Amino acid sequence: SHSYFDLSMFVGKNCKNVALVGKAVIDMRSVWDEDGVRGEAIVHRGPKCIALKECDNVEIGDLEIYNVTDLAVYFAGCNNVDIYGIKMRVYIDGISPDNSKNVRIHDCEMETGDDGIVFKSSYTLNRLDICKDIHVWDCKIKSRCSALKFGTETNGGFEDILIEDIHIC
């Protein structure tokens, strides 16, 4: 998840009070060949859409995100994150909290080529840490892999995670 972090469309490191909100469309016009067969492995991965590291008080809401060939919304070591009203159709993972705490993900609709929401506890921050105090609710997830997943790149752990009212297609 940490590879090519700085090449993401929206990058934030050690930021406070970050908001990416509004009735906006982000279409990354992927490198995927539209003539290809859905579900084929993507050979060329482009940049992540939104990538944040060690940020506090993050709000991401009311966005449409399309054609991302890497992680759509990835955040590592962040605290107090609110993600809501996201509609996405992407080729890899949708939302990936990594070693983050006090996270709320709600009222989102996603169609992903890989995992819908994947909780990670990787070594991307060069230390062991955990995902903690996460609440996910009122989301619709259509995925070619795991709609909800715990454990990719996990070295730390998970604590106090509540998932409710999820519709998996």
Q: What does each of the following model-derived ranges do?
A:
Residues 1-169:
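Extracellular/periplasmic carbohydrate-active domains that bind, remodel
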